[in-house]
Amino acid sequence: VSHDAVSDYLAQARSTAHQLWQLVQPLLNDSPQAYLIVDDSVQDKRYSNQIELVRKQYSGAEGGLVRGIGVVNLVHTDGVEGNYYPIDYRIYAPQQDGKSKNDHFRDMLTNAVSNKRIKARGVLFDSWYASVQNLKLVIRLGLVFVTTPLKIGIRQPVEQ
């Protein structure tokens, strides 16, 4: 399976996270030197009025609110340029499933380490994900973390 095959697969409609994992698992060079990356993105749907999952949300790429579909992604890298493989994702749809982006962060990270047996030594993420609950989970899973600098005076999300 080539990198292009993964890209083509992701472009297909109705791909599940489990199907994605089955496709990319043989491509991973998983080791204790690997890292996981958690990031979210917004698929711009500003001209779509009939799609159920479209909602207003912040887009870093746009620097403001846009109508779109939010996706939280978990990516694996072995540090070699070009070796970035999505291994899990979640659609951010709090009205449908009641889950926050932080819930998805914890679910995907736990699944990667406990079920998929990923050997990566650490996880990289934006400071938005640096909640107390998330950091405790990262430590419990035996991972190190790297995050963007926390802003002084800005309250980080703390979930119970």
PLM features: what roles do these ranges have?
Residues 36, 85-87, 146:
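Hydrophobic/aromatic beta-strand patches that form the interior of the parallel beta-sheet core
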Residues 6, 20-24, 28, 105, ...:
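Generic structural signal of hydrophobic/aromatic residues within well-ordered alpha-helices
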Residues 2-8, 13, 59-119:
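Electropositive, glycine- and tryptophan-enriched low-complexity nucleic-acid-binding patches
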Residues 46-51, 85-88, 135-136, 158:
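Short, conserved acidic/polar surface loops in the N-terminal third of protein domains
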Residues 9-81:
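Active-site-proximal, Lys/Arg-enriched surface segment
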Residues 91-160:
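An internal, acidic/charged active-site-proximal segment
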